[in-house]
Amino acid sequence: MFDGTTQAQDVAAAFQGEISGKTFVITGVSFGGLGAAVCEALAPYGPGHLIITGRDIQRPQEVAKALIAQYPDLQISVIQMDLALPKSVENAAQEIKKVASRVHVLVNNAGVMCIPDRTLTEKGIEAHLAINYVGHFLLTKLLAEQMSSTDSSPVQGRVINVSSSAHTVSPFRFGDPHFIGSSDLLPDEEPSREACKAFGIPWETSYSPLVAYAQSKTAVILHAKAISSGVLRDGITAFSVNPGGKWNPTILYVLCHC
């Protein structure tokens, strides 16, 4: 029975037969983060292949080195990917396809939180939205063929989008996703006054670091729902998950800067 005290290792142990021999792609892997924790939970149970990514390739390489030291037979590949850059995502997808003909589980974990000043990528996309959602949207689309079930490989691929309780702060701002001008927002696209109060942030429709982060987490929830409805491809199931609280570098950054 799982409850609020359940750890990742508990779930992995209970479903180890579903891990053995499977290929997992996990984005945003570094020591102290959720990505590394996922790897550590999976590694004891014989995954067929762990493919891990990071913007700074040294970080997932360090995790891979530690895992191999503990599990010498573990097959693990490390790929550089910057989710803010579509070309980097495309290159990473090609590298993944070279080392794995089938992807059973894609964990869209990488993310940023509470960038103090409104920042746009080279494509003009607000940074939280670009990295937390758009980059993962593209990666998922590019790997769809590798994840969909076939007659020879009937197991449905699974997409796991890491969300957050912060999604309650903001719906998706269809009228102004990049915080250019809030005059185009409809009332039901505005931040939640109640949630802003609960999180201890001022209510405003202009750029707010936590509101921008929250919008991106709403987006990944909607993304998972759309995938499960068959929009992307038949034979793929998607989930959005709230991982709960964890002390990690992102949280420490928020405490120091937001």
UniProtKB/Swiss-Prot annotation:
Biochemical pathway: Secondary metabolite biosynthesis
Pfam families recorded for this chain?
adh_short (PF00106)
Q: Does the keyword Kinase apply?
A: no
The molecular function terms of the Gene Ontology recorded here are: oxidoreductase activity
User: Which amino acid positions bind NADP(+), per UniProt?
Assistant: L34, R59, D82, N109, K141, R193
EC no. given is 1.1.1.-
Q: Where is the active site?
A: S163 (proton donor)
Which UniProt keywords are given for this protein, alphabetically ordered? NADP, Oxidoreductase
Q: Does the keyword NADP apply?
A: yes
Q: Which InterPro entries match?
A: NAD(P)-bd_dom_sf (IPR036291), SDR_fam (IPR002347)
First-level EC class: oxidoreductase
Protein task: Oxidoreductase; part of the fragmented gene cluster that mediates the biosynthesis of fusarochromene, a tryptophan-derived metabolite closely related to a group of mycotoxins including fusarochromanone. Within the pathway, fscI catalyzes the formation of the chromene ring from the prenyl moity added by the prenyltransferase fscG. The first step of the pathway is the epimerization of L-tryptophan to D-tryptophan in the presence of the NRPS-like tryptophan epimerase fscC. D-tryptophan is subsequently hydroxylated by the tryptophan 6-hydroxylase fscE to yield 6-hydroxytryptophan.
Hey, which family's this protein in? Belongs to the short-chain dehydrogenases/reductases (SDR) family.
Q: What is this protein called?
A: Oxidoreductase fscI
